[in-house]
Amino acid sequence: MAVSQTTLWNLISGILGVICLLLMTTMGILLKNLLLTESIQPTLSPGPITELQKGSDCCSCPKRWIGHQCNCYLFFDELKSWTESRDFCASQNSSLLHIQNRDELRFVSSSKYFYWIGVYYSKENGTWLWENGLALPQDLLQTIQTFDTKKCVIYSSSHSVLDVSCEDKSRFICKQELM
């Protein structure tokens, strides 16, 4: 009886060992495929983008852009300075994000990172301006302190607005206004 119990436990151990080996192999293959997929995904190039995707009821957006209220948005994860970000957006026929209303503010608040937006400090006017020269509405974004003005602004999903050096590197949001 003792011999048959030992044989049974050896058999069960062997089967469980094979199952564990198969699970580990499967996990390794899945992890390899995930890493390979992430490494070969194309990065957005500054060239023209012709492949379109449906954005909302009134617009089609370039691939990798997100449509909302007849505008297209690109949440770009490469770190660039404010000027580099602005220039990249311009090369895509867009501009750094200019938030126009609370609905748009809610839409861009879905991200967890800080992003450059199209706001800078004008020493000439002594105020914060959008990239297009319009004044920043006080009721839309949290008031930005101007004690030690660093000149450019990053925004996060917690409605945090920070002034930082324009030379710092950050993610950024480009916006194409289609209407």
UniProtKB/Swiss-Prot annotation:
The subcellular location is:
Cell membrane
Supply one GO molecular-function term.
carbohydrate binding
**One BP annotation, GO:** innate immune response
Topology within the bilayer: Single-pass type II membrane protein
On whether Glycoprotein is a keyword of this UniProt record, the answer is yes
**C-type lectin domain span:** 68-175
Q: Extracellular compartment: which residues?
A: 32-179
* Residues exposed to the Cytoplasmic side: 1-10
SUPFAM superfamilies documented for this protein: C-type lectin-like
**A single GO CC term, please?**
plasma membrane
Disulfide linkage: 58-70, 61-72, 89-174, 152-166
- What keywords tag this UniProt record? Adaptive immunity, Cell membrane, Disulfide bond, Glycoprotein, Immunity, Innate immunity, Lectin, Membrane, Receptor, Signal-anchor, Transmembrane, Transmembrane helix
Q: Which residues are glycosylated?
A: 93, 125
Give one Pfam family.
Lectin_C
Principal subcellular localization: membrane
InterPro entries on file: C-type_lectin-like, C-type_lectin-like/link_sf, CTDL_fold, NKG2/CD94_NK_receptors, NKR-like_CTLD
Membrane spanning residue stretches: 11-31
The subunit field of the Swiss-Prot or TrEMBL record says: Can form disulfide-bonded heterodimer with NKG2 family members KLRC1 and KLRC2. KLRD1-KLRC1 heterodimer interacts with peptide-bound MHC-E-B2M heterotrimeric complex. KLRD1 plays a prominent role in directly interacting with MHC-E. KLRD1-KLRC1 interacts with much higher affinity with peptide-bound MHC-E-B2M than KLRD1-KLRC2. Interacts with the adapter protein TYROBP/DAP12; this interaction is required for cell surface expression and cell activation.
- Functional description taken from the UniProt entry: Immune receptor involved in self-nonself discrimination. In complex with KLRC1 or KLRC2 on cytotoxic and regulatory lymphocyte subsets, recognizes non-classical major histocompatibility (MHC) class Ib molecule MHC-E loaded with self-peptides derived from the signal sequence of classical MHC class Ia and non-classical MHC class Ib molecules. Enables cytotoxic cells to monitor the expression of MHC class I molecules in healthy cells and to tolerate self. Primarily functions as a ligand binding subunit as it lacks the capacity to signal. KLRD1-KLRC1 acts as an immune inhibitory receptor. Key inhibitory receptor on natural killer (NK) cells that regulates their activation and effector functions. Dominantly counteracts T cell receptor signaling on a subset of memory/effector CD8-positive T cells as part of an antigen-driven response to avoid autoimmunity. On intraepithelial CD8-positive gamma-delta regulatory T cells triggers TGFB1 secretion, which in turn limits the cytotoxic programming of intraepithelial CD8-positive alpha-beta T cells, distinguishing harmless from pathogenic antigens.
Q: What is this protein called?
A: Natural killer cells antigen CD94
